[in-house]
Amino acid sequence: MTRVLLLALIVSGCGREPKAAVADSAGARLEAAAETAGIVPDPNAPLQGSWARDTDRICVGGTDKSARIGVSVDYGEDQGCTASGTVERSGDALKLAFGACRFDARFDGDRIVFPPEIPEACESLCTGRASLAAVTVDRISESRSEASTLRSSAGKLLCAN
């Protein structure tokens, strides 16, 4: 009898779908309020704009799916990197292409983070001991016109069409 009850309980659990999280739950409302207040980054925030931290600068111009991207890393004394290319966004993943230099980066709504290891093809974009590895920048502006003004140390526009 015990075996029959146990078997009935196991079989009765089959085929049931797990409960989906309710969009109007307390947790969902708290998350939405935190995003609105700026406490939690909005992962759906637009990618376009100007980004910076210290001497690292990034510009992004175009649509959210595919856009122009420019990167300037300037440590002075012939130590820096300059790159211009394209970026494709898929959720929080960014696929960057600067000619033969291609890698994935992360985007959380407020920050762009390059991986700690960059392909060898990217070395040609840098001088001295500078690297694109682990570049991390924070949003400065969502303005497309401001992003289009970023220049390399040689004066080249990095996000121009």
Role assignments for model-derived ranges:
Residues 1-12:
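Sec-dependent bacterial lipoprotein signal peptides
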Residues 56-95:
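N-terminal glycine/threonine-rich, aromatic-flanked beta-hairpin/loop signature
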Residues 27-59, 146-161:
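Tryptophan-anchored aromatic micro-motifs
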Residues 14-17:
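Bacterial signal peptide processing site
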